[in-house]
């Protein structure tokens, strides 16, 4: 049955939502009503599948906490007033914490002047952010294209590589098994999980996948493509595979890939959407090997957890293909003043507080604790691994991983799995996590594993 549009209903719903936005706290009845509403509207108007997913990581088979507000820099509070240490970090967006006051202040100050650009006049913050990124990023990276998300930054990188290499007769892209580069059509062609790919086949032609971390497989692919005339335009990869399960390549892998790209005349695209902005103990993960890509993709934490923003940064040689017609690839909201204000403030906080170094120190502490737990619970934990504040605990099977997420939820620590590896729980907290909170997380993990062992023994 067709439903007629109702302006009156839309007005009432929007007014109700605005009233909630104005509130700082909810009483008990308001909290219960909001929980019911959110569950109903997710089921009827967003996607009911999300409710089942949330059930897998919450206690007691409930539909889970309805997020209400940030607590401190490193915590979340639900509608019931329960505070959780955030070890998920919005899949890596909260590197400088929740509602970092420097970032919030920058956005508020810009909002008081001009929230969005006119599209005709030159907007100063876009220029200033591009200049800042040129100074911050490694090698000859110089020009920036701004967008709103990681998948958009990857799309821009792929189009830029095509525009540069097409006149040279190079059209093939090499990606890696286990990779995640986004879910729009181009980015999905580089992503390597069949669950996401199959419903949208056929994807873009010209993409090949080789095992991640296997430099001989990469060499063979580049060589075979050259022999068959399918010359490679670019190699795209993550320095550390995030959604693949926090998979670290062998030492020297990125350096070797860079040399192969130079040998075969292929561009090197590094997707640092998740590993960038200090996450791994360096501002960018490629800096661990002093590797300089031709194109670098950023997003997630670039906006400081306050505004969405992505960036595709390239060398002048590559980016110059857009000079004659800068409208070949654009986006209405990319590089808007609010997002640029957030990004500039985020970079300032990361550098002023030396958060990449803190990520290395606190990441080592957490990883040592998780590895000790892996030794204590070999029947449950297969491995703990990571770099900086990007870590993973891999369990012996998928179900144990789900149970661990639920047990950690009971301990008031928020974690979740990775999209391409169901056995793996990701640990990706804000870089501002305190030493005391690191200790709390390790204690919570120990309690969770102890409870899980009891459940297994009783089963």
UniProtKB/Swiss-Prot annotation:
<comment type="function">
    <text>Catalyzes the aminotransferase reaction from putrescine to 2-oxoglutarate, leading to glutamate and 4-aminobutanal, which spontaneously cyclizes to form 1-pyrroline. This is the first step in one of two pathways for putrescine degradation, where putrescine is converted into 4-aminobutanoate (gamma-aminobutyrate or GABA) via 4-aminobutanal. Also functions as a cadaverine transaminase in a a L-lysine degradation pathway to succinate that proceeds via cadaverine, glutarate and L-2-hydroxyglutarate.</text>
</comment>
<dbReference type="InterPro" id="IPR015421">
    <property type="entry name" value="PyrdxlP-dep_Trfase_major"/>
</dbReference>
<dbReference type="InterPro" id="IPR050103">
    <property type="entry name" value="Class-III_PLP-dep_AT"/>
</dbReference>
<dbReference type="InterPro" id="IPR005814">
    <property type="entry name" value="Aminotrans_3"/>
</dbReference>
<keyword id="KW-0663">Pyridoxal phosphate</keyword>
<dbReference type="GO" id="GO:0033094">
    <property type="term" value="F:putrescine--2-oxoglutarate transaminase activity"/>
</dbReference>
<dbReference type="InterPro" id="IPR017747">
    <property type="entry name" value="Putrescine_aminotransferase"/>
</dbReference>
<dbReference type="GO" id="GO:0019161">
    <property type="term" value="F:diamine transaminase activity"/>
</dbReference>
<dbReference type="InterPro" id="IPR015424">
    <property type="entry name" value="PyrdxlP-dep_Trfase"/>
</dbReference>
<comment type="pathway">
    <text>Amine and polyamine degradation; putrescine degradation; 4-aminobutanal from putrescine (transaminase route): step 1/1.</text>
</comment>
<keyword id="KW-0032">Aminotransferase</keyword>
<dbReference type="GO" id="GO:0042802">
    <property type="term" value="F:identical protein binding"/>
</dbReference>
<feature type="modified residue" description="N6-(pyridoxal phosphate)lysine">
    <location>
        <position position="300"/>
    </location>
</feature>
<comment type="similarity">
    <text>Belongs to the class-III pyridoxal-phosphate-dependent aminotransferase family. Putrescine aminotransferase subfamily.</text>
</comment>
<dbReference type="GO" id="GO:0030170">
    <property type="term" value="F:pyridoxal phosphate binding"/>
</dbReference>
<feature type="binding site">
    <location>
        <position position="332"/>
    </location>
    <ligand>
        <name>pyridoxal 5'-phosphate</name>
    </ligand>
</feature>
<feature type="binding site" description="in other chain">
    <location>
        <position position="274"/>
    </location>
    <ligand>
        <name>pyridoxal 5'-phosphate</name>
    </ligand>
</feature>
<feature type="binding site" description="in other chain">
    <location>
        <begin position="150"/>
        <end position="151"/>
    </location>
    <ligand>
        <name>pyridoxal 5'-phosphate</name>
    </ligand>
</feature>
<dbReference type="Pfam" id="PF00202">
    <property type="entry name" value="Aminotran_3"/>
</dbReference>
<dbReference type="GO" id="GO:0019477">
    <property type="term" value="P:L-lysine catabolic process"/>
</dbReference>
<dbReference type="GO" id="GO:0009447">
    <property type="term" value="P:putrescine catabolic process"/>
</dbReference>
<protein>
    <recommendedName>
        <fullName>Putrescine aminotransferase</fullName>
        <ecNumber>2.6.1.82</ecNumber>
        <ecNumber>2.6.1.29</ecNumber>
    </recommendedName>
</protein>
<keyword id="KW-0808">Transferase</keyword>
<dbReference type="InterPro" id="IPR015422">
    <property type="entry name" value="PyrdxlP-dep_Trfase_small"/>
</dbReference>
<dbReference type="InterPro" id="IPR049704">
    <property type="entry name" value="Aminotrans_3_PPA_site"/>
</dbReference>
